[in-house]
Swiss-Prot record:
Post-translational modification: Phosphorylated.
InterPro entries (alphabetical): Ribosomal_eS6, Ribosomal_eS6-like, Ribosomal_eS6_CS
Organism encoding this protein: Kluyveromyces marxianus (Yeast)
Gene3D superfamilies: 1.20.5.2650
Pfam family, one: Ribosomal_S6e
One GO cellular component term noted in the UniProt record for this chain: ribonucleoprotein complex
PROSITE patterns listed in its UniProt record: RIBOSOMAL_S6E
A Gene Ontology biological process term: translation
Protein name: Small ribosomal subunit protein eS6
GO terms for MF: structural constituent of ribosome
Name of encoding gene: RPS6
Phosphoserine: modified positions: 229-230
Signal peptide as annotated in the record: none
Superkingdom, taxonomy of origin: Eukaryota
Family membership: Belongs to the eukaryotic ribosomal protein eS6 family.
Length: 235
C-alpha cells in the first residue's frame, strides 16, 4: 500500500510505499477523519499522529466520506457531491465509490500530519513549499499583514513577476470586497433608486385604486339610472 503523507503547514506531500502489510494493518477498520498513531507504522514515524483523509482502491475508485462500508457502492450523485463533477446543469449520475472504512483492498491511503514527531520525514517536514499566490480578498490581506481599517490594502497586494518573451512585468490580482469611495457612492445611488422606485410604485398603486373607485362609482350610477328608467317605463 502507498501512503500519501501531506503536511499542510509546509505545503508539502510525499508518497511512501510500504510493502509489509503488518505495518499498515493499524489503519484497517478505521474511518476517514480518524487519527492514528504513527509509531505503529514504523519507527521513522515515532511521535507522529496521522489523520486519514481519503484514498483509492486498486481499481482507482475514490473513498467517500459518509459511506460507512469497507466495500464499493453505487450512489446517485448530483452537483455539490464529492467524487462527482456534473457536465450539465441539473445532471445526476449513479457512480461507484469506495466506502470510508479502510481495508486491505486500498492501493493508496491519504494521510495528513496532525502532530509532528521527533524525527524529520525527508521531503515532507524538512522542506517548505511557498504559496504561489498571496491572499486576494481585502479582509484576508489585512489579516495576513496585520493591517487596520485605516491602512490602504492596495499598497500591500503581493505582486508576482511574469516573463513574456524578453519582457518582464509584475502582475497583481484584483482585490475582492474592497471598499472604495466609488463603491460607497454606488451603494448610496442604488439605495436612493430603490426608495424612488418604491415611492413611484406606491403612487401608481394609489392612482390606480382612485381610478378603480371612480370607475366603480360610475358603473353603479349607470346601473341605478337604468333601473330608474326601467321602473318609469313599467309604470
Amino acid at each position: 500500500m502507498k501512503l500519501n503523507i501531506s503536511y499542510p503547514i509546509n505545503g508539502t506531500q510525499k508518497c511512501v510505499e510500504i510493502d509489509d502489510e503488518h505495518r499498515v494493518r493499524v489503519f484497517y477498520d478505521k474511518r476517514i477523519g480518524q487519527e492514528v498513531d504513527g509509531e505503529a507504522v514504523g519507527d521513522e514515524f515515532k511521535g507522529y499522529v496521522f489523520k486519514i483523509a481519503g484514498g483509492n482502491d486498486k481499481q482507482g475508485f475514490p473513498m467517500k466520506q459518509g459511506v460507512l462500508l469497507p466495500t464499493r457502492v453505487k450512489l446517485l450523485m448530483a452537483k455539490g457531491t464529492s467524487c462527482y463533477r456534473p457536465r450539465r446543469n441539473g445532471e445526476r449520475k449513479r457512480k461507484s465509490v469506495r466506502g470510508a472504512i479502510v481495508g486491505p483492498d486500498l492501493a493508496v491511503l491519504a494521510l495528513v500530519i496532525v502532530k509532528k514527531g521527533d524525527q524529520e520525514i525527508e521531503g515532507v517536514t524538512n522542506e517548505t513549499v511557498p504559496k504561489r499566490l498571496g491572499p486576494k480578498r481585502a479582509n484576508n490581506i489585512r489579516k495576513f499583514f496585520g493591517l487596520t481599517k485605516e491602512d490602504d490594502v492596495r499598497d500591500y497586494v503581493i505582486r508576482r513577476e511574469v516573463t513574456k518573451g524578453e519582457k518582464t512585468y509584475t502582475k497583481a490580482p484584483k482585490i475582492q470586497r474592497l471598499v472604495t469611495p466609488q463603491r460607497l457612492q454606488r451603494k448610496r445611488q442604488q439605495k436612493a433608486l430603490k426608495i424612488k422606485n418604491a415611492q413611484a410604485q406606491r403612487e401608481a398603486a394609489a392612482e390606480y385604486a382612485q381610478l378603480l373607485a371612480k370607475r366603480l362609482a360610475e358603473r353603479k350610477a349607470e346601473v341605478r339610472k337604468r333601473r330608474a328608467s326601467s321602473l318609469k317605463a313599467a309604470e
